[in-house]
């Protein structure tokens, strides 16, 4: 009887652990939680949030990007976008640093700076 009680206790403990790890983290990390974006995070976020938005809009109109049609390298595209968009952010959107580097901003707030 003590052996079966021990195994039952272990099974319940394991079940509790699995339930806690599976369901306990659902509401702890939201993809749109505010975060600080400074330095190279600004062009990276711009590439992830704004370029995807532009590319999706082109797909909706049935106009895929010519770079994607030619099978352009994603790393080349990211490097060029970082170079071009970093300059664009410095000139046109000076407020993105004040808004998202000095205090945290969500993805929705960052998308307001998309050109």
UniProtKB/Swiss-Prot annotation:
Sites bearing 4-hydroxyproline, chain numbering: 34, 104
GO MF assignments: hormone activity; toxin activity
Where, by tissue, is this protein expressed?
Expressed by the venom gland.
List localization entries: Secreted
Cross-referenced Pfam families: Insulin
Q: Which GO terms describe its biological process?
A: glucose metabolic process
Keywords in alphabetical order: Amidation, Carbohydrate metabolism, Cleavage on pair of basic residues, Disulfide bond, Gamma-carboxyglutamic acid, Glucose metabolism, Hormone, Hydroxylation, Secreted, Signal, Toxin
What are the coiled-coil residue ranges?
Answer: none
Signal peptide residues are 1-24
Q: How does this protein assemble?
A: Heterodimer of A and B chains; disulfide-linked.
Name used for this protein in its record: Con-Ins T1B
In its UniProt entry, the species of origin is given as: Conus tulipa (Fish-hunting cone snail)
């Amino acid at each position: 009887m003590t052996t079966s009680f021990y195994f039952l206790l272990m099974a319940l403990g394991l079940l509790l652990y699995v339930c806690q790890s599976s369901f306990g983290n659902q509401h702890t990390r939201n993809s749109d939680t505010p975060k600080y974006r400074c330095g190279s995070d600004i062009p990276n976020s711009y590439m992830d949030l704004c370029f995807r938005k532009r590319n999706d809009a082109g797909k909706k109109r049935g106009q895929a990007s010519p770079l994607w049609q030619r099978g352009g390298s994603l790393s080349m595209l990211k490097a060029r976008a970082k170079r071009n968009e970093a300059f664009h952010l410095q000139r046109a959107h000076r407020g993105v640093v004040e808004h998202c580097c000095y205090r945290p901003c969500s993805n929705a707030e960052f998308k307001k700076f998309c050109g």
